[in-house]
């Protein structure tokens, strides 16, 4: 179920403050955040966010196509190592 339109998109206050501060200061450093649940807004376009995936920070550069998604969608938390392959039986005669 999606979020109610009358509530508006969710973004952590500290993340919005960091974004606005970087925007007015023309700061190009990545913004470090643990807030994977925050929605990407148009004000965030052009900035790089270091999003924590539980182990390391993943750099995410925000473009127009990212607006409306959550920051956590671009920093995967699980490492897929592949399915178990079929064991080839060697027939030697």
From Swiss-Prot:
GO molecular function terms listed in the Swiss-Prot or TrEMBL record: rRNA binding; structural constituent of ribosome
PROSITE patterns associated with the record: RIBOSOMAL_S19 (PS00323)
Keywords carried by this UniProt record: Ribonucleoprotein, Ribosomal protein, RNA-binding, rRNA-binding
One cellular component term from this protein's GO annotations in UniProt: cytoplasm
Signal peptide: none
Matches recorded under InterPro entries: Ribosomal_uS19, Ribosomal_uS19_bac-type, Ribosomal_uS19_CS, Ribosomal_uS19_SF
Superkingdom of the source species: Bacteria
GO biological process: ribosomal small subunit assembly; translation
Family listed: Belongs to the universal ribosomal protein uS19 family.
Function comment: Protein S19 forms a complex with S13 that binds strongly to the 16S ribosomal RNA.
Protein name: Small ribosomal subunit protein uS19
Species, as recorded: Helicobacter pylori (strain ATCC 700392 / 26695) (Campylobacter pylori)
